[in-house]
């Protein structure tokens, strides 16, 4: 696979319209995420031809270039440095060939932009969740792995035994990071959410803290807020992450509106004061009760879907489509709801089966292709990341361009999801021990259940194997006919 080089980044920057067209450059684990002033200037055909680019996902809010695991962060760092150098005049930007004076071209471009705005409102909204949660993913994974290893040590050396003090201290030490993360996670999310929707992150963090504080003066744990009611109105800090997101999203809009009317000289002093006073009322009186009901409803819906084999199959089968459109981060609030309701994330292993279907489908294409086929080289380069839970190289490099294998990969994922849902229906729900984590075989140590981690790990492994096998067979016999295997 192509390395990330200065030349490649220069080509990408030129193809997206130059530094003047890039408002913001960031990344997630596998994608370079750009906020462009005008998406229509970007030449997708040229971008896709640049070595190392696996695909492009476009929305009105973000222009996502898929580069694969371990490359997106490096690309973002290089591009930000290049943009800074161009702005400072240290380097000359690569010329962009674009005929913007042609009236028909301008009209066509405007039509494209308007159509995007009309058809992708949900996609634009959900894409912001990537901005909110992607920076937190490494912490989720680290805390989850440490908790998984701590639980494993606990079951092997503590339960029904007389453990050493060192072992008890080690287990407590490995667990403390997860406790710290989840104790203040709402504040981190509030900060990111308000910032993502155009407000000040610190205001979002303060609003989120209203859900963390305690309102019972007799409570023996937590931080007492100093108030038990709001002007005679009982405070019930329900809603968890749903309430925090609602408060931050609405708070960003309120802050922007306040700033419109606030004199520049007073902006630094009063904008946040007015925003917090307004949002405090809205949060205590409206958002907390509504957020609580939404949180309960979301938990009930997905608990019932997860415990239903058909529901689980549908969720797993459709998940790859959400990845293609870049809206899969929209499931993260659901993960929080399930963590609150069950103590683990029972949706994640179901959705992870989609990656297993990709692996099986890609292996089938490998065996169907001739020994000297380019397809075999593509599969070789992407199959290991796929097994480890990073499926985008397989999606954009192998199955999606050939369409039929993508469909049969979804079928493989649905089969694995059906199995996970069936086991849950029979009384053994399994899930991730943290909100978010890696999928594929890397997720095995993070699996748990009410019957312990070994049962959770076993169910997950069997589900993955089913996804591999069904994805392979469906593709080998049905998904490779009339498909380019060169």
From Swiss-Prot:
TM regions (residue ranges): 129-149, 170-190, 196-216, 230-250, 268-288, 312-332, 347-367, 381-401, 411-431, 453-473
Active site: 28 (phosphocysteine intermediate)
GO MF term set: kinase activity; protein-N(PI)-phosphohistidine-sugar phosphotransferase activity; protein-phosphocysteine-N-acetylmuramate phosphotransferase system transporter activity
Subcellular location(s) of the protein: Cell inner membrane
Gene3D superfamilies: Glucose permease domain IIB
Domain remark from Swiss-Prot or TrEMBL: The EIIB domain is phosphorylated by phospho-EIIA on a cysteinyl or histidyl residue, depending on the transported sugar. Then, it transfers the phosphoryl group to the sugar substrate concomitantly with the sugar uptake processed by the EIIC domain.
Name of the protein described by the UniProt record: PTS system N-acetylmuramic acid-specific EIIBC component
Provenance organism: Vibrio vulnificus (strain CMCP6)
């Amino acid at each position: 696979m192509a390395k990330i080089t200065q030349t490649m980044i220069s080509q990408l920057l030129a193809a997206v319209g130059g530094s003047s067209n890039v408002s913001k450059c960031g990344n997630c684990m596998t994608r370079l995420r750009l906020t462009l002033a005008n998406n229509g200037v970007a030449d997708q055909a040229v971008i896709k031809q640049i070595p190392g680019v696996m695909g492009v996902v476009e929305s009105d809010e973000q222009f996502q270039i898929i580069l694969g695991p371990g490359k997106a962060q490096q690309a973002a760092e290089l591009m930000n440095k290049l943009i800074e150098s161009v702005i400072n005049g240290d380097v000359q930007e690569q010329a962009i060939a674009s005929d913007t004076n042609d009236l028909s071209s301008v009209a066509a471009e405007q039509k494209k932009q308007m159509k995007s705005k009309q058809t992708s409102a949900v996609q634009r909204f959900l894409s912001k969740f990537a901005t909110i949660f992607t920076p937190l993913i490494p912490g989720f994974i680290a805390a989850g792995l440490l908790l998984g290893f701590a639980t494993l040590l606990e079951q092997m050396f503590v339960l029904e035994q007389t453990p050493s003090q060192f072992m008890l201290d080690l287990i407590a030490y490995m667990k403390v990071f997860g406790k710290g993360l989840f104790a203040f996670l709402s504040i981190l999310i509030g900060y990111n959410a308000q910032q993502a929707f155009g407000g000040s992150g610190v205001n979002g963090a303060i609003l989120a803290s209203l859900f963390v504080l305690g309102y019972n003066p007799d409570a023996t744990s937590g931080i007492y807020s100093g108030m038990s009611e709001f002007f005679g109105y009982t405070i019930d800090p329900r809603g968890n992450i749903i309430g925090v997101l609602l408060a931050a999203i609405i708070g960003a809009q309120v802050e922007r509106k306040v700033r419109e009317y606030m004199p520049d000289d007073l902006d630094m002093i009063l904008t946040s004061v007015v925003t917090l006073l307004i949002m405090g009322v809205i949060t205590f009186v409206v958002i907390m009760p509504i957020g609580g009901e939404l949180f309960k409803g979301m938990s009930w819906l997905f608990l019932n879907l997860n415990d239903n084999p058909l529901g689980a199959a549908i969720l797993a089968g459709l998940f790859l489509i959400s990845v293609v459109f870049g809206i899969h981060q929209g499931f993260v609030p659901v993960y929080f709801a399930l963590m609150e309701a069950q103590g683990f994330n029972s949706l994640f292993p179901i959705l992870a089966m989609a990656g297993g279907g990709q692996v099986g489908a890609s292996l089938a294409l490998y065996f169907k292709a001739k020994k000297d086929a380019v397809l075999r080289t593509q599969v070789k380069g992407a199959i290991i990341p796929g097994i480890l839970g990073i499926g985008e190289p397989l999606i954009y490099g192998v199955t999606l361009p050939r369409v039929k294998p993508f469909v049969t990969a979804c079928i493989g994922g649905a089969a694995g999801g059906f199995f996970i849902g069936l086991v849950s229906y029979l009384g053994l729900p399994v899930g991730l021990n943290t909100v978010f984590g890696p999928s594929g075989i890397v997720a095995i140590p993070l699996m748990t259940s009410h019957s312990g981690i070994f049962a959770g790990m076993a169910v997950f492994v069997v589900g993955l194997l089913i996804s591999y096998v069904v994805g392979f067979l469906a593709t080998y016999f049905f998904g490779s006919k009339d498909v380019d295997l060169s």
